[in-house]
């Protein structure tokens, strides 16, 4: 049952907002769209190196989050797209690992404890097994370098040589991570669907999440990306769409909004029409609140 203090219910619903002009602007942009969760890049996602966060920016970010009621468990930083923690070439792997540690350090400075990342790609040069081992080893090295921050592996659509599209890939990485309290999964609905796991009906959702529980374990689910898909089931192509406009449809998103297994984790829109985010957030919240009234 919600009360006036908890008008959002038990769901953390938001979107990946811009940090242009400074990361301290991200919580303001999230609240403008009615969100009580958000994702952000803590640096330019298409550059290897960024200048360190300034103390005044860190303080302003923390102050804005406190003012607007965003706790660390409602915020999902995303790392750079350049990083490949399973890179087959030693130089690229080392560069990726150093960049990932830097991303974790930035999270720590901002008082955040989750870091969402794409697992990695073998580039057709090493085996899947070798690549998954390198990804796990990269996480272990980052854990040794930076305390507290949880490495949140995002499942992928299966494009090219990217790993992480099968639940078994995620399980194999986690199995090789030493500190399992600091590793988790972010399930992207578009990626899940594109990889071949059906989400179009409540029954399909039930089966897919039962499979995730069997192979990985729901206790590892630390976040979700809520996206419809422009492409058909098992297409292995990553093309996000606005909710209800794609191949998945609203039944899936209503299912997630009403199911308590997805409470208290960031549920982040990365849909392609940001002008629709306020309506998408409002609709998801309506579904959620109707289920707990």
From Swiss-Prot:
Q: Tell me the SMART domains matching this sequence.
A: AP2Ec
Job of this protein: Endonuclease IV plays a role in DNA repair. It cleaves phosphodiester bonds at apurinic or apyrimidinic (AP) sites, generating a 3'-hydroxyl group and a 5'-terminal sugar phosphate.
The catalytic activity, as recorded, is:
Endonucleolytic cleavage to 5'-phosphooligonucleotide end-products
Q: How is the cofactor bound?
A: Binds 3 Zn(2+) ions.
Q: Where does Zn(2+) 1 bind?
A: 78, 118, 154
Q: What is its EC number?
A: 3.1.21.2
Instruction: Please give the Pfam families that the UniProt record associates with this protein.
Output: AP_endonuc_2
Question: What protein name applies here?
Answer: Probable endonuclease 4
Which family, according to the similarity comment?
Belongs to the AP endonuclease 2 family.
* InterPro entries according to UniProt: AP_endonuc_2, AP_endonuc_F2_Zn_BS, Xyl_isomerase-like_sf, Xyl_isomerase-like_TIM-brl
UniProt-annotated binding residues for Zn(2+) 2: 154, 188, 225, 270
Organism, by scientific name, is Vibrio vulnificus (strain YJ016)
Keyword list, A-Z:
DNA damage, DNA repair, Endonuclease, Hydrolase, Metal-binding, Nuclease, Zinc
In the record, biological process GO terms are: base-excision repair
Q: Which cofactor does it need?
A: Zn(2+)
Gene Ontology MF annotations: deoxyribonuclease IV (phage-T4-induced) activity; DNA binding; DNA-(apurinic or apyrimidinic site) endonuclease activity; phosphoric diester hydrolase activity; zinc ion binding
Record-annotated membrane-spanning stretches? none
Positions that bind Zn(2+) 3: 191, 238, 240
- Give the matching PANTHER family: APURINIC-APYRIMIDINIC ENDONUCLEASE, ENDONUCLEASE IV ENDODEOXYRIBONUCLEASE IV
